[in-house]
Amino acid sequence: MQKMHNSEYLKELSVNNISYKIYDINKAASDIDLPLKKLPYSLRVLFENVLRTGSKQNLMVFKEWLKNKKSDAEIDFMPARVLMQDFTGVPAIVDLAAMRDAMKKIGGDPLKINPLIPVDLVIDHSVSVDSYASGSSFDKNVAMEMRRNIERYQFLKWGQQAFNNFKVVPPGTGICHQVNLEYLAKVVWHSNGVAYPDSLVGTDSHTTMVNGLSVLGWGVGGIEAEAAMLGQPLTMILPEVIGVKLTGKLTGTATATDLVLKITEMLRKKKVVGKFVEFYGEGLKAMTIADRATISNMAPEYGATCGFFPIDQETIKYLELTGRDKEQIKLVEEYAKAQDLWCNFDDAAEYTDILELDLSEVTSSLAGPRRPQDRVNLGDVSSGFKKELSTFSSNNISIDTKHAVANQNYEIGNGDVVIAAITSCTNTSNPSVMIGAALLAKKAIEQGLKVKPWVKTSLAPGSKVVTEYLKSSGLNQYLDQLGFNLVGYGCTTCIGNSGPLNPEIEETINKNGLVVASVLSGNRNFEGRINPLTKASYLASPILVVAYALSGSLNIDLTNHPLGKNDKGRDVYLKDIWPSKEEIDKVIANSINSSMFVEKYSDIFSGTKEWQSLEVTSSSNYAWDKSSTYINNPPYFENIGSKNSIKDIKSARILAIFGDSITTDHISPAGSISKTSPAAKYLTDHQISPIDFNSYGSRRGNHEVMMRGTFANIRIKNEMCKGVEGGFTINQLKNMQQTIYDAAMDYKANGVSAVIFAGKEYGSGSSRDWAAKGPQLLGVKAVIAESFERIHRSNLVGMGVLPLIFTNNMTRFDLKLDGSESIDIIGLNEHIKPYNSVKCIIKKQNGEMQTIDLILQIFTDNEINYIKHGSIMHFVVENLKNNHI
């Protein structure tokens, strides 16, 4: 627990004869003439955090915010806890282990490297859909997961005994955000007799999901999370808050999925990157916590830091449903009411800007084929896909041409759906859409409909409670009959662990250059993310996932075209089998109860026999195995103790020029490792066969693999290499095309710095610290873009890489770059400040020179310190050694 401040504001709160101390935010606000009720609820939570953990003087920032509805001032945020998943958690624990070694190296106490606040790591990112459409799929996939990841899991188990305040939820339990929502989150925390709002940061961008339960939290990079664990505050500009007023209620066939896709479309257009979004209005009264969580989950997709819902009676009902302790539930209610954190629907809060949405106007929709914000009405999917088809290939593509699949009695063509996945915490946490999908499956079977044979189907819920209520309702059998058998409790298809397709189908796709599709109930559909062979991907509710598995094609308009014929030869349309809200609600009422949650979470930290049998050492410092291809001591601290200086970048080479919306998936892919990639060569050289390559995400504990995987996404397009897809560039020292990794290593060997140019929204997507670590290890000193996504900008700074933006609406196109230029960045020194302007001198091969202004995207003095020390990790280690933290 963090050190407490401003004790004069402590007062007693009695709940069921138990006395708690709380920090009286009403009194503190009154003392500075701040009308607390005019602050958005999310900022009231931050106000309490600053009052409890910081200086009273910093509270004036909130008064300034209310005057201008924004602020340029900094606050220090001290989250109550940290949430991790294994893909981002493994490298974070690797860093902590390396920091212990670094502390020892510079003469400090290694045991100072210990989490000071609770850290929960949920293993959910490693299970893959290898087996599907079978009753034995779950067992087979779990066995495969354990075999592939035993070394990683041993490392995490070592970390659990080596570090204080660190717990691991074993594999096969659930998805971290759903586990957080259903079990870990407290809404109001209490420690040492003091009660305060639950809050967190997580090493996954969808940490935002818990804001639906009124717990303020968002995703950060692993390196920021490490700093937070070790007592370092997260310095942030008090954000603008966009209020979204919700009215009415969902009607007809509209689901929470349709609503979140509408909100994502709306808020992306509004441009809310770096801002809080807060939902309010009478429409909240018709929304369950599950619906709210779906909306909060996709905050990264609409660009916001978080999408917050205040505490109300629905919060209490959800805590009761999920079996939380009665005393805890009463504390939540009494605390919220005492602190003016209880939503009273009076619209008194004031926002930076306001949008309104009538829920009754939401209609059935999907989002795709490449971005979550590209919402398409259900009736327009077929025509919309046909218009998009030409953007996937320069060749003339026909919708009508079909190609035979070897050894099968069917054909496939462009637009056919080859993956239909009920996946992701976004939707599997919501009983209304899960029961809806199961009811649709039941009605489809009763009508004699079947899933098309070329569709790979899967069901991967975010918690064991989902399968429990599906069994309780008797509906699981219908999903099973359609091939939506349980494949695992984890992220699976949503993060690219969709597993291989039928080999004959893969051959047909590759041979004919087909543009086939996936339809999933996930939150991201960036090109190449779901499966390397599905160029088009659409996000949809679980109900529509089942529908598209039945149709097998995007070329069919499901609003007007039949899904098939029943046993009487009569056409069956989607509307004929769509379950009504009344049907769904009845099943939910009869099939879901609190005892399910209590039972399934009673042994959450126990794990399977395989997990329990993993043997680990009891050492406080990790015993690195140099031959390991999973866990390796990273090189970040090789120069720890030596002075780092900020200096101008001279004669740098352009490593790559990228377009808009380059995601962290593009920069550091999480999925499969191509057999022709530099990472594959490294693994092969270490006697790892292709079948055991596993994924990039699973190997994030080994910098050698991850360096080679940086910019290795097969769909990334470097504008220096015309007409070429994948991680290639032109090595200017040799005037030849090479992989980005090989060229970067050549530059480093010759003492040449590298820079990146890019368009808008650079680094959007997952909170993937390797998207910053990788470029740093490749020698990238700066990234110059039109704009950066919030988490990635922070990660770059944390690794000592400078994020810079163009001025005066300039773009890379105005510079007419071809990649052969030499780059100087002038004005970098020990006196730099946040938002400084620097000069960029571009020297062309013909001798021409151009000088432009760039703005440093470093926002706080703390971030300046990270740059001065070389990284946030160096800053933390050196300050811990000197007892400055």
From Swiss-Prot:
Co-factor binding comment: Binds 1 [4Fe-4S] cluster per subunit.
One of the Pfam families matching this protein, by short name: Aconitase
EC supergroup of this enzyme: lyase
GO molecular function: 2-methylisocitrate dehydratase activity; 4 iron, 4 sulfur cluster binding; aconitate hydratase activity; metal ion binding; mRNA 3'-UTR binding; mRNA binding
Pathway(s) annotated for this protein in UniProt: Carbohydrate metabolism; tricarboxylic acid cycle; isocitrate from oxaloacetate: step 2/2; Organic acid metabolism; propanoate degradation
CDD domains: AcnA_IRP, AcnA_IRP_Swivel
Keyword Iron assigned: yes
Residue numbers binding [4Fe-4S] cluster: C425, C491, C494
Keyword list, A-Z: 4Fe-4S, Iron, Iron-sulfur, Lyase, Metal-binding, RNA-binding, Tricarboxylic acid cycle
Reaction equations catalysed: citrate = D-threo-isocitrate; (2S,3R)-3-hydroxybutane-1,2,3-tricarboxylate = 2-methyl-cis-aconitate + H2O
Required cofactor names: [4Fe-4S] cluster
Superkingdom, taxonomy of origin: Bacteria
GO BP: propionate metabolic process, methylcitrate cycle; tricarboxylic acid cycle
Function description: Involved in the catabolism of short chain fatty acids (SCFA) via the tricarboxylic acid (TCA)(acetyl degradation route) and probably the 2-methylcitrate cycle I (propionate degradation route). Catalyzes the reversible isomerization of citrate to isocitrate via cis-aconitate. Could catalyze the hydration of 2-methyl-cis-aconitate to yield (2R,3S)-2-methylisocitrate. The apo form of AcnA functions as a RNA-binding regulatory protein.
Family indicated by similarity: Belongs to the aconitase/IPM isomerase family.
Family matches, as NCBIfam families: aconitase_1 (TIGR01341), PRK09277.1 (NF006757), PRK12881.1 (NF009520)
Summary of subunit composition and partner proteins: Monomer.
The protein, known as: Aconitate hydratase A
Source organism phylogeny: Bacteria, Pseudomonadati, Pseudomonadota, Alphaproteobacteria, Rickettsiales
Name of the gene: acnA
